[in-house]
């Protein structure tokens, strides 16, 4: 199974580097040189091997083997990057989850009332924040005081909302 790890949002420079918006965790591992990513370009899967990786102004900058100029990489703008899930050899600590396990989960409050579905995750430094789409969009911090139970198998999450969190 493949998991989405980012989207190529633009080119950078003239030597074939791309600007990637990550929607994944463990980017330092996923994007390291030698890692193989899949791009689904015009309904055709292509394997791209990372040649170099760096972070620049909040974006992940990747260069792929065999792509040496802007013309070779321009075609991939807007395409999504994927990586094999079974390739994930990242050891998770207790209460750590892959983004792909959390995104798509339904969030419930203490009264078992659905709040919405996790549609995105972003890192703030101190903790992750989950974007939950329900009647409106909620930002749920992934902290022990709020997130009480995560059931990966059933894709459900139970939270105890702090005052004002769902206003």
Swiss-Prot record:
GO BP: ribosomal small subunit biogenesis; rRNA processing
Keywords tagged on the record: Chaperone, Cytoplasm, Ribosome biogenesis, rRNA processing
Domain PRC barrel positions: 94-165
One GO MF term attached to the UniProt entry: ribosome binding
Subcellular location: Cytoplasm
GO cellular component: cytoplasm; ribosome
Keyword Chaperone: yes
InterPro entries in alphabetical order: PRC_barrel-like_sf, PRC_RimM, RimM, RimM_N, RimM_N_sf, Transl_B-barrel_sf
Keyword rRNA processing: yes
Pfam families: PRC_RimM, RimM
Function: An accessory protein needed during the final step in the assembly of 30S ribosomal subunit, possibly for assembly of the head region. Essential for efficient processing of 16S rRNA. May be needed both before and after RbfA during the maturation of 16S rRNA. It has affinity for free ribosomal 30S subunits but not for 70S ribosomes.
Similarity comment: Belongs to the RimM family.
HAMAP family with a match to the protein in the record: Ribosome_mat_RimM (MF_00014)
Quaternary structure annotation from Swiss-Prot or TrEMBL: Binds ribosomal protein uS19.
Domain commentary: The PRC barrel domain binds ribosomal protein uS19.
The protein, known as: Ribosome maturation factor RimM
């Amino acid at each position: 199974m493949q998991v989405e790890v980012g989207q190529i949002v633009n080119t950078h420079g003239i030597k074939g580097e791309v600007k990637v918006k990550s929607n994944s965790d463990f980017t330092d591992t996923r994007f390291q040189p030698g890692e193989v990513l899949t791009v689904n370009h015009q309904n055709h899967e292509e394997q791209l091997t990372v040649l170099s990786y760096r972070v620049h102004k909040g974006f992940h900058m990747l260069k792929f083997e065999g792509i040496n100029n802007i013309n070779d990489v321009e075609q991939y703008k807007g395409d999504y990057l994927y990586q094999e899930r079974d390739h994930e050899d990242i050891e998770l600590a207790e209460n750590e989850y892959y983004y792909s396990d959390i995104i798509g989960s339904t969030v419930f409050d203490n009264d078992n009332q659905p709040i919405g579905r996790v549609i995105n995750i972003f890192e703030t430094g101190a903790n992750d924040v989950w974007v939950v789409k329900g009647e409106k969009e909620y930002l749920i911090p992934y902290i022990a005081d709020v997130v009480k139970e995560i059931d990966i198998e059933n894709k459900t999450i139970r939270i105890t909302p702090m005052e004002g969190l769902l206003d």
